[in-house]
């Protein structure tokens, strides 16, 4: 082997070996235990960033570790290639999204190879190709035929100037990002998949996911939002308002029913439209509400606004008349779009009632009998009913049941289960996505495109004007036939979450002449380890779980869930610096262009950019283009080698925590690999070592061998069960420090060092595979890619001797080395006769001797 560690040449050589030998190409093998490891596939944005590198390094470490456990490991990669950024880049660079996307894929593929990830490239695909989305289109038509797909009008962001629909991220402060025109909400027909049909199963099956972080499961439970309540009807005073006889509301707190003082309805509620017909002021308010898109999370903090409709509702039990208001905090797509308002016991209702001078009627008091005060805020806890007629004195559950029973008996309400989860809207009014395979004939009937006419291909040779989708602008593209009749194609495309909801399954049989080949899919699925960011908890991870159940019910897979174990890696942070420009805005400066001075504690005391300007340190924040604080992985690989970058990524922080990028840490990782290289080189230059003869080892040799096997046991557990990769690396580093100081003179010394170095190299292999490949060969072993993970020798862990601490009156006076099986009497005799101990006990009476087996002897004397 070469004397100096030269990662660049070495890594190229090893990567060529993997490519030439198709090392990571796998197929189904019923005689081998399978392991499917998957990192969330990348969007081909142009260049890898450090977040990608962290995600894919974790996946590669897990894959290679499992490979050395003797498993049949599949680790595929592909490209989540549709989406809005490609459209924006195409407009900016005067090209079409397709060539921009394919160029990026080629560049990023090369970057992934340079990092040494062990992917089965035979399974690679990009979701923007017809070979992929054709099966998605066909599956969608099957769902339509099963009644799981429907079309209804739904609200979108509309720019009246550009006459186009905007994605949420294209709306900035309520205006179009391109022309700054105020954005309106517009109702247009869109396609939906009935995920709500699976809401209960999606909720229940979270309990099966023992390998998922609790936090992600909690987020999904909240997103699905199952609640038990009562759907009840308030009659309208004028017995019938244009065909509406009553007003349905849903409540989870029927115990508060006697405290209702008004009813709130959403701006999109049919009654609101009726009430506004002869009321221009109300019509204007409704329009304002519709054009103010409110996220559910903002409802609690936003200003509550409303307007009376002039309609009156009648309380279903006590007959009291209550006004009906349009309120901006009532959402049309939750429950019935109407709420019974109980200001004394709901904070939003309280704020609204206070603002508009509506009655506040308390009907619940604390169980403990403490005083009830609703003058400043609502009392929202569950308690005991009062001023509620026959229900007085009942606590929550009893009141819930009694009031629900009375409403049911009178035909005015029913107990019901509600879900916060809404059906999945899959229509996007964009170009760069998979065309939705539906057509409309001249009689207005909608039909799925027949399977023999699929795929509906998205034209790639287009001109982007940045406003209208090319397939909407090209009237000829939409023209087609259905059963010989003229028809028009759907010009919306699928939400890109569609492609990412089943890609994990396509990897099992990427060339299959169907969405999946069941026998292959059922060999590999479910995914054993999935790795990705927690920001995908409620969308991608939920849609994938849903899609898996759809595939199961269509007979393609037998499992209920797609991902057995989930690891959510933390973000990568870096220093960020800025200066204020003439307009008072922040100009962000790349950290590589900043010279910093630090005090003794490492805090930044001064920072200047390359032009000598003072810049402000904004702290360690997430690497991003907007803050200009991303570090190019390519530069780091060119400078230090892929193994060093991988080692730093896995060592600098626990995998699920944020990682602070420090180049000094990268340098430290590089120094460590040089030390490993040097020690192996020194050892192998002296020739081959013999086999270990455990019986012939000295005490020191046994102790060193024990350290080696303890390290193997710890590293195995840290990588496999605990997934604390950083502590595994720390243990290897600690062992290396001992090996560097270990004697190498005798044959037995060299034997132990040989065993230890082979263990170190094998344990480093998942993390730093290139250097490990080379050092393994230098140590006389063949092909580390197919080697076995080191196993620890239980006998080597057994200690022949133990060190006992001896205290006199609680103070350390001696340390004894005794046989591991020494009795209490033997230890006491040795301790009491120890030369140093007797100095402190001479002339004293020994009152008590306390022995903690294998650890401590405490002598009490006075």
UniProtKB/Swiss-Prot annotation:
Its main location: cytoplasm. GO terms for cellular component: cytosol. Pfam families: Anticodon_1, tRNA-synt_1, tRNA-synt_1_2, tRNA-synt_1g. It catalyses: tRNA(Leu) + L-leucine + ATP = L-leucyl-tRNA(Leu) + AMP + diphosphate. A motif ('KMSKS' region) lies at residues 622-626. PANTHER family: LEUCINE--TRNA LIGASE, MITOCHONDRIAL, LEUCYL-TRNA SYNTHETASE. The gene is leuS. It comes from the Bacteria. A motif ('HIGH' region) lies at residues 42-52. This is Leucine--tRNA ligase.
């Amino acid at each position: 082997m070469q004397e100096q560690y030269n990662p660049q040449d070495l890594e190229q050589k090893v990567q060529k070996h993997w490519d030439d030998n198709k090392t990571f190409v796998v197929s189904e093998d019923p005689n081998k235990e399978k392991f499917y490891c998957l990192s969330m596939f990348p969007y081909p944005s142009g260049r890898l960033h450090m977040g990608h590198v962290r995600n894919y390094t974790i996946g590669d470490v897990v894959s290679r570790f499992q490979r050395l456990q003797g498993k049949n490991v599949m680790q595929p990669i592909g490209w989540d290639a549709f989406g809005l950024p490609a459209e924006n880049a195409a407009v900016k660079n005067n090209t079409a999204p397709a060539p921009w996307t394919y160029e990026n894929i080629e560049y990023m593929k090369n970057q992934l190879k340079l990092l040494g990830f062990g992917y089965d490239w035979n399974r690679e695909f990009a979701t923007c190709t017809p070979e992929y989305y054709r099966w998605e289109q066909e599956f969608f038509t099957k769902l339509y035929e099963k009644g799981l797909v429907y079309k209804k009008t739904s609200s979108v962001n509309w720019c009246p100037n550009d006459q186009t629909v905007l994605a949420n991220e294209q709306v900035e402060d309520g205006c179009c990002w391109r022309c700054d025109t105020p954005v309106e909400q517009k109702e247009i027909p869109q396609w939906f998949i009935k995920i709500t049909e699976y809401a209960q199963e999606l909720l229940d099956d979270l309990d099966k996911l023992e390998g998922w972080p609790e936090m992600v499961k909690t987020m999904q439970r909240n997103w699905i939002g199952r609640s038990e309540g009562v759907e009840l009807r308030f009659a309208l005073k004028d017995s019938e308002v244009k065909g509406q006889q009553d007003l349905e509301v849903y409540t989870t707190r029927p115990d508060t029913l006697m405290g209702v003082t008004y009813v709130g309805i959403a701006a999109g509620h049919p009654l609101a439209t009726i009430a506004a017909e002869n009321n221009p002021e109300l019509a204007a308010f409704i329009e304002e509400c519709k054009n103010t898109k409110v996220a559910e999370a903002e409802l609690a903090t936003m200003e509550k606004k409303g307007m009376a409709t002039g309609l009156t509702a009648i309380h279903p039990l006590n007959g009291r008349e209550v006004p009906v208001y349009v309120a901006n905090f009532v959402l049309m797509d939750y429950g019935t779009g109407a709420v019974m308002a109980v200001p004394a016991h709901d904070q939003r209702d309280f704020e609204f009632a206070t603002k508009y001078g509506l009655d506040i009627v308390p009907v619940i008091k604390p169980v403990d009998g403490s005083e009830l005060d609703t003058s400043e805020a609502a009392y929202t806890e569950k308690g005991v009913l009062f001023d509620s007629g026959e229900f007085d004195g009942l606590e929550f559950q009893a009141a819930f049941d009694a009031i629900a029973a009375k409403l049911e008996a009178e035909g005015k309400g029913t107990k019901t289960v509600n879900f916060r989860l809404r059906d999945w809207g899959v229509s996007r009014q964009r170009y760069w996505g998979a065309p939705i395979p539906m057509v409309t004939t001249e009689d207005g009937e909608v039909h799925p495109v027949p399977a023999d006419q699929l795929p509906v291909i998205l034209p790639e040779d287009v001109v982007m004007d940045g406003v209208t989708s090319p397939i909407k602008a090209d009237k000829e593209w939409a023209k087609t036939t259905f059963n010989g009749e003229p028809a028009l194609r759907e010009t919306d495309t699928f939400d890109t979450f569609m492609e990412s909801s089943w890609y994990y399954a396509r990897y099992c049989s990427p060339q299959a002449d169907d969405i999946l080949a069941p026998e292959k899919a059922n060999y590999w699925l479910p995914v054993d380890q999935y790795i990705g960011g927690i920001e995908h908890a409620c969308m991608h991870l939920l849609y994938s779980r849903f899609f898996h159940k759809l595939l199961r019910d269509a007979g393609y897979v037998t499992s209920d869930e797609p991902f057995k174990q989930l690891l959510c890696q933390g973000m990568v942070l870096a220093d960020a610096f800025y200066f204020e420009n003439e307009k008072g805005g922040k100009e962000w400066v790349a950290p590589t262009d900043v010279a910093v001075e630090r005090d003794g504690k490492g805090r930044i005391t001064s920072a200047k950019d390359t032009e000598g300007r003072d810049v402000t340190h904004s702290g360690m924040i997430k690497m991003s283009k907007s803050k200009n604080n991303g570090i190019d992985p390519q530069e780091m690989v060119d400078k230090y080698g892929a193994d060093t970058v991988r080692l730093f990524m896995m060592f600098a922080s626990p995998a699920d925590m944020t990682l602070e990028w420090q180049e000094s840490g990268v340098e430290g990782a590089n120094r460590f690999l040089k030390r490993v290289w040097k020690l192996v080189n020194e050892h192998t230059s002296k020739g081959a070592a013999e086999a270990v003869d455990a019986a012939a080892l000295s005490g020191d040799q046994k102790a060193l061998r024990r350290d080696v096997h303890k390290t193997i046991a710890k590293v195995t557990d840290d990588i496999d069960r605990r997934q604390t990769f950083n502590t595994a690396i720390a243990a290897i580093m600690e062992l290396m420090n001992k090996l560097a100081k270990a004697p190498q003179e005798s044959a037995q010394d060299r034997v132990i060092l040989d065993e230890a170095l082979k263990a170190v190299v094998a344990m480093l292999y998942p993390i730093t595979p290139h250097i490990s490949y080379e050092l393994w060969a230098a140590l006389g072993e063949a092909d580390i890619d197919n080697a076995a993970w080191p196993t620890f020798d239980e006998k080597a862990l057994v200690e022949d001797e133990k060190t006992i601490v001896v205290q006199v009156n609680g103070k350390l006076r001696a340390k004894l080395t005794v046989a591991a099986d020494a009795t209490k009497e033997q230890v006491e005799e040795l301790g009491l006769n120890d030369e140093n101990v007797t100095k402190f006990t001479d002339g004293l009476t020994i009152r008590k001797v306390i022995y903690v087996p294998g650890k401590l002897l405490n002598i009490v004397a006075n």
